[in-house]
């Protein structure tokens, strides 16, 4: 059975690629947060992650249109047939974002869905580059030209985007409406793109000071760590989650070991 959880560095260069039968996860730009000077000033930008459907080809996903019945399910199915961008970084990183997308063969007009994990400028500062994409920013889901649709996302009800692809409500850092993207079955296991639920590997001594709701964020962190094999944090390198195995008394008896 599962025991304590620990985290450790995930070695690899950016862009990090984790592929699966349905989607590939590519960390395009690694976020950072660097103290500046003697005061509390920080230079920061958020991590940007690309989720590519298997078999996607440029030009195949353009022309996203509202669903005929106005329902969010059909609209979401349409939105995930092309490249999905999770956060966009700040506007000061516009050039770096465009270059990173081009490296993956993706133009801004190819992107069919942008997920903003929360409403801070270093995470959604380039939304204007993607006017043809559907937007899921925090809990607001809208189609191009501003048609907003309901969807029912909450902590107890994830938003299913596709097979092995979900959006979770993970409140805390920016308030009650933060989200994370969960991609199952990749070559690295389950990858959770967590926004600032996790600032970076080893942030245990600092995340509370940046949180709007530390109690809710602690709950979100524990929930993510219970399923993730890899976490993509908001301001650092992706890291691995390792679950220690604790043997049950039945296992120990089978091995011939005494149980007190």
Swiss-Prot record:
Family in the record: Belongs to the metallo-beta-lactamase superfamily. Glyoxalase II family.
Annotated cofactor note: Binds 2 Zn(2+) ions per subunit.
Top-rank EC class of the record's enzyme: hydrolase
PANTHER family for this protein: METALLO-BETA-LACTAMASE DOMAIN-CONTAINING PROTEIN 1
Keywords per UniProt: Cytoplasm, Hydrolase, Metal-binding, Nucleus, Zinc
Presence of the UniProt keyword Metal-binding in the record: yes
InterPro entries the record matches: MBLAC1 (IPR039344), Metallo-B-lactamas (IPR001279), RibonucZ/Hydroxyglut_hydro (IPR036866)
Annotated Zn(2+) 2 binding sites: 122-123, 196, 235
Known function: Endoribonuclease that catalyzes the hydrolysis of histone-coding pre-mRNA 3'-end. Involved in histone pre-mRNA processing during the S-phase of the cell cycle, which is required for entering/progressing through S-phase. Cleaves histone pre-mRNA at a major and a minor cleavage site after the 5'-ACCCA-3' and the 5'-ACCCACA-3' sequence, respectively, and located downstream of the stem-loop. May require the presence of the HDE element located at the histone pre-RNA 3'-end to avoid non-specific cleavage.
Binding positions for Zn(2+) 1 per the UniProt entry: 118, 120, 173, 196
EC number: 3.1.27.-
One Gene Ontology CC term in the entry: nucleus
Single GO term (MF): metal ion binding
Subcellular location, record wording: Cytoplasm, Cytosol; Nucleus
Keyword NADP attributed: no
Domains as described in the record: Contains four of the five characteristic MBL-fold metal-binding motifs, with two waters completing metal coordination.
Protein name: Metallo-beta-lactamase domain-containing protein 1
Organism domain of life: Eukaryota
Pfam families, alphabetized: Lactamase_B
Subunit structure of this chain's protein: Homodimer.
Taxonomic source organism: Mus musculus (Mouse)
Listed cofactors: Zn(2+)
GO annotation (BP), single: mRNA 3'-end processing
Catalysed reactions listed for this entry: a ribonucleotidyl-ribonucleotide-RNA + H2O = a 3'-end ribonucleotide-RNA + a 5'-end 5'-phospho-ribonucleoside-RNA + H(+)
């Amino acid at each position: 059975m599962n025991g304590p959880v620990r985290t450790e560095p995930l070695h690899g260069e950016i862009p990090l690629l984790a592929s699966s039968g349905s989607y590939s996860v590519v960390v395009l730009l690694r976020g950072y947060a660097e103290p500046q000077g003697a005061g509390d000033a920080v230079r920061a930008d958020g991590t940007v992650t690309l989720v590519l459907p298997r078999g996607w080809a440029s030009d195949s996903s353009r022309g996203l249109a509202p669903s005929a019945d106005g329902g969010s399910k059909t609209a979401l199915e349409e939105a995930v047939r092309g490249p999905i961008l999770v956060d966009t970084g700040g506007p000061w990183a516009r050039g770096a974002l465009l270059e990173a997308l081009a490296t993956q063969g993706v133009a801004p007009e190819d992107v069919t869905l942008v997920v903003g994990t929360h409403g801070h400028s270093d995470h959604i500062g380039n939304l204007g580059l993607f006017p043809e994409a559907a937007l899921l920013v925090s809990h607001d889901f809208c189609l191009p030209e501003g048609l907003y649709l309901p969807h029912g996302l909450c902590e107890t009800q994830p938003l299913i985007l596709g097979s092995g692809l979900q959006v979770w409500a993970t409140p805390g850092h920016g308030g009650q409406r933060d989200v994370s993207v969960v991609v199952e079955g990749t070559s690295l296991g389950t990858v959770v793109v967590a926004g600032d639920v996790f600032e970076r590997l080893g942030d245990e001594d600092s995340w509370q000071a940046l949180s709007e709701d530390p109690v809710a964020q602690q709950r979100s962190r524990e929930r993510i760590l219970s399923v993730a094999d890899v976490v993509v944090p908001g301001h650092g390198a992706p890291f691995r989650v390792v679950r220690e195995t604790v043997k049950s008394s039945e296992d120990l008896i089978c091995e011939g070991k005494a149980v007190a």
